[in-house]
Amino acid sequence: VSIEPPDPTGTTTSTPSSTDSSPAVPDPFSSTRPWAMQLAMRDERASRPAHLAVCEAAASAVVRLLTDPRSAPGGEWYPFVHHWASGPIRKVVRRGRGVTFTRIQELAGAEVEHAGAQVRAFVPGPVDQVPAALAKMQVGGTDMPERGEPSAPVEGGITVALTPLTPMTTGKSAAQSGHAAQLALGEMTGDEQLLWEKSGWAVRVVTPDAAEWAQAVRTARVAVRDGGFTEVAPGTRTALAWW
């Protein structure tokens, strides 16, 4: 049994007949390539978002997608989210502007606008089957010139700390923030999740100094150790989260 990817336009799809000459939709579950959750950030030349705002928006977008009813058992996104979350929770952050970013609004996902940043998280799939509109967006070198400031603490929200020991681009930092938020969601009690939801899935991202990081490592409730696909060595502790 094969499951078709969620239709990004929301329209009804049908299985081609034997006389239909249109190309068959590839079965994502038959791919041998790694799966990833793609994220896209808006990066307009005239109004570039701050580094920390992108990280906070990305983390919230990840959680919004994971808590969407369509990601729950029985939902149309569930087979894809479950398959991906059962393995390495890889995330790929892309950037685009203008019409390039507008076009990806039609793809299934969850979007967050926060403090001048706009980030959309997409239903996971194999890295060799990224929708064309999304595949056109740039991946490497996503680094914002302005760091910005962490958002104010929000009751029920979480704090994510990024390591000061290893340099990371904005794209990498946003992915790590998303990992930390996802792990936090999985570690929370039901009551803690409800409080977080009431906060609007608020995420505050901070960049501690080395001493503060060492203390946070001892007290944080979750820690992210990166797989080492890009920028950092495998096993690097890249982010922490607490609430």
List each model region and its residues.
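Positively charged, small/polar-rich N-terminal and surface patches that mediate targeting and assembly
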Residues: 1-203, 208-211, 216-217, 221-243
